């Protein structure tokens, strides 16, 4: 009998170079993600990377996994549906601080449900792709193209927000963390909602406007009351698992068929018509 030898995958990356600006932290973050997936010996066919809009939204095309690219701020909703439909998939969301703010309600719901997805927030404190506008994580006093005299809004603490709402694993760090791949491994190994708020430098805009540096970023975390490190780790029931257990008694049963729509009015149209609703 012949023996089949399976060679472990050495990388999940394609051969294409990243499109990010020189000094941008997005590339190192993706490299650490690639390292983590390789160490976990995942099957690319069972991994789905979900992204939306912005510089972070370019990420999924540089991996050999399945991917879903959708609307700004909605990546968590897509990921939730994918995980509920097939709980055996490893579902990873890559989003920016812009998408996090736009999809804030989705973020809260995913944390409350403790749905088993891993969310990586590439947090560079502004909307980098569209010209450096301020986002929900831009610090007070931060200079951006939309806050030229300094941001007046208090920044969103992403980790505290999901932490108090039930997330199973919450970590804050930066693209410079030596153990970032370890953190990704731990997050993806957590049977529940895991979020990593990974700060990085937007060298095109925020760095230039604020003279922001690596040392300044790490000091800012503490001075702004946003301590780095593992902030929450809980052993709670994952939503997709709990949902199936709660509905086990009706699993496989048929659902109601489509109901006919009664015709109340006749039409006088002689040809097909199209209607566009915009809003």
Per-range role (PLM):
Residues 20-22, 93-95, 169-174, 195:
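Short catalytic-loop micro-motif centered on adjacent basic/acidic residues
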């Amino acid at each position: 009998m012949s023996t089949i030898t399976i060679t472990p995958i050495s990388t999940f990356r394609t051969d294409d170079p990243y499109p990010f600006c020189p000094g941008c932290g997005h590339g190192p973050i993706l490299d650490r993600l690639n390292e983590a997936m390789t160490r976990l010996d995942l099957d690319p066919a069972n991994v789905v990377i979900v992204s939306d809009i912005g510089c972070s939204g370019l990420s999924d095309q540089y991996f050999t996994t399945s991917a879903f690219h959708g609307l700004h701020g909605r990546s968590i909703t897509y990921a939730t549906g994918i995980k509920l439909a097939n709980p055996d998939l490893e579902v990873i969301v890559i989003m920016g601080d812009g998408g996090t703010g736009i999809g804030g309600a989705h973020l809260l719901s995913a944390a409350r449900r403790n749905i088993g997805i891993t969310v990586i927030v590439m947090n560079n404190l502004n909307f980098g792709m569209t010209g450096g506008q301020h986002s929900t994580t831009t610090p007070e006093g931060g200079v951006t193209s939309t806050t030229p005299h300094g941001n007046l809004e208090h920044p969103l603490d992403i980790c505290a927000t999901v932490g108090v709402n039930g997330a199973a694993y919450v970590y804050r760090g930066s693209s410079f963390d030596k153990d970032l791949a370890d953190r990704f491994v731990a997050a993806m190994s957590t049977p529940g909602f895991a979020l990593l708020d990974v700060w990085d430098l937007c060298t095109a805009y925020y760095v230039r406007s604020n003279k922001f540096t690596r040392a300044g970023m790490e000091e800012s975390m503490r001075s702004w009351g946003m301590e780095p490190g593992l902030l929450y780790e809980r052993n709670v029931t994952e939503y997709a698992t709990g949902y199936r257990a709660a509905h086990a008694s009706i699993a496989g049963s048929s659902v109601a068929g489509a109901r006919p729509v009664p015709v109340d009015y006749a039409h006088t149209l002689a040809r097909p018509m199209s209607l566009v609703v915009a809003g």
